[in-house]
Amino acid sequence: MARIEQARTTADPALYAAAEKALRRSLSLQPGGNSGAETGMAALAAARHEFTAARTWAEKAITSDPYNPAAYGVLADAHTQLGHYRDAERAVQKMNDLRPDAASLARASYVFELRGSTGRAAELMRRSLTAATTDSERAFAHACLSGLALEDGDARQALSEAEQGLRKAPADPALLDARARALAALGQTKQARADWQHATDIAPLPHLLLALGETHQALGHDEQAEASYTLLRAQDTLRTSAGGSPDTDAILFEADHGSPVRAVAMAEQALRTRSFVAVHDAYAWALHRAGRSEEALAHADQALALGTRNALWHYHRAAIHHALGNDQAATADLRSALGQAPALNPLHAAQARALSQRIGTQP
């Protein structure tokens, strides 16, 4: 499991192969009732974005040991990414019934975050922080609390949470990302860029590379932006050549900075195995950028159907409504996006404000 987490957080696919080799050896030595290895295989499949396989392995692990909370956690993750939100909630409840530890409470927090209940999500994440027994659990909780504060428009609280986490884990990429987003929201764009650069040096993950590239672009540093985008393309090639489905950030990158037509194809491939709200948003944006805004609207609606508070998704739907001539609906989404403006990176914030000015929306 440690190798899986290391691969997921460092973007090193070679570690997945090492983890799989160890897990399959365990299964060969104990082919039946090996809930630990089956849970590991489920986590490995989820890390590779093979969510149907993750669900199957998690169900095997639960059959082997119905009292394995970690198996219910991976099952919840798989159901979430497959778009089976009620099934995910039931799995999270079972996980918490068995062991209400940091991991269980963090998943419960995410259930409420997806539903737009950020206050309840923050409350549960604080309980997760209190229950944390490892530095990685504490770092994860602080990063999530920072993100929830941004979604609520409180950039200073977001910065405080990120900095608390970084005092214990100064090289944690998720915390560096969280601080960068908070700094950007507070207008400290150069400091934000430095944090994103540090984060990508540690873990060149797609969402970090995209944030760094778009921040360089917002600052007019086109050469540096292109360097980040080139690395993002290379990372996506590594993922897909290893059999993984396209990442949502790679789809959004392609839609905005590459070929929208290719972005549509990537999103369609991702949706075949992952009907998650973030994939619907990426597909909607790719369709819109490819000139297919009428088709895009249904997917933008699906992305926001749970009530998730996400400034970027609201901006995307606002742009789609505007393209379709429905400025009243665009105005409503822009108000949601600009009300959560701290959650937008500098490039997206500027784009949302520009759209607002074009249609006369007051934030």
Language model region names:
Residues 9, 13-16, 51, 85, ...:
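TPR-repeat structural position
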Residues 1, 5-8, 43, 77, ...:
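Residue-level recognition of tetratricopeptide repeat
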Residues 6, 10-13, 48, 82, ...:
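Structural motif corresponding to the intra-repeat A-B loop/turn of tetratricopeptide repeats
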Residues 1, 34-36, 70, 103-104, ...:
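Start-of-helix register in tetratricopeptide repeats
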Residues 25-26, 60-61, 94-95, 127-131, ...:
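Canonical positions in the second alpha-helix
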Residues 39-40, 74, 107-108, 141-144, ...:
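Canonical tetratricopeptide repeat
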Residues 31-32, 66, 99-100, 133-136, ...:
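Short coil turns that delineate tetratricopeptide repeat
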